């Protein structure tokens, strides 16, 4: 499934899908729906212009999924980049969009860093299996990484090394 880089004009659609993911899967993201819903649209526009975010459209033209790549900027961590904000809407699941987004992120990082890292809730077996199938390997666990209400979420760290 084709993916494309999202830019400032895509900010309203990006904001919509991002907030949907935060609302429907609060234990899957470090950010909260409340925090990001309070951000002005201009913040989403700036994130798209300054960062690297991919999106894939469904046949109806609506964004079906998104994933971002953030490059570290400090001397000692510049060899790594982070895959963040991965979310595929339920109607787009099983279409190959998740694989296309991950491939696009890895391709963008190739030749620029030594590895792409991500974190995923250790309870999210489907996401972990998808990342493993794409070449990511588990490399650590952060216990109690997130606290959603009164529930703690452990994050599995995974890495794709070039």
What would you call each of these model-derived segments?
Residues 61-65, 126, 152:
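Glycine-rich acetyl-CoA-binding "A-motif" of GNAT/NAT acetyltransferases
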Residues 76-77, 85, 89-103, 121-129, ...:
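Conserved glycine-rich acetyl-CoA-binding loop
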Residues 109-119:
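Conserved GNAT acetyl-CoA-binding A-motif
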Residues 117-121, 132, 137-153:
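Conserved catalytic-core motifs of GNAT/GCN5-like acyltransferases
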């Amino acid at each position: 499934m084709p993916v494309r880089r999202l830019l400032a004009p895509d900010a309203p659609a990006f904001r919509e899908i991002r907030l949907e993911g935060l609302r429907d899967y609060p234990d899957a993201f470090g950010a909260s729906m409340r925090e990001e819903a309070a951000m002005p649209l201009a913040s989403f526009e700036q994130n798209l212009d300054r960062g690297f975010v991919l999106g894939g459209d469904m046949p109806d033209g609506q964004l079906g999924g998104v994933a971002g790549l953030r490059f570290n900027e400090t001397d000692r961590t510049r060899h790594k980049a982070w895959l963040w904000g991965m979310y595929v809407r339920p109607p787009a699941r099983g279409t190959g969009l998740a694989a296309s987004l991950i491939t696009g992120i890895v391709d963008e990082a190739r030749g620029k860093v030594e590895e792409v890292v991500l974190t995923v809730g250790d309870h999210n077996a489907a996401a972990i299996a998808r990342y493993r199938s794409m070449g990511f390997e588990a490399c650590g666990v952060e216990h109690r990484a997130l606290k959603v209400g009164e529930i703690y979420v452990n994050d599995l760290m995974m890495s794709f090394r070039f």
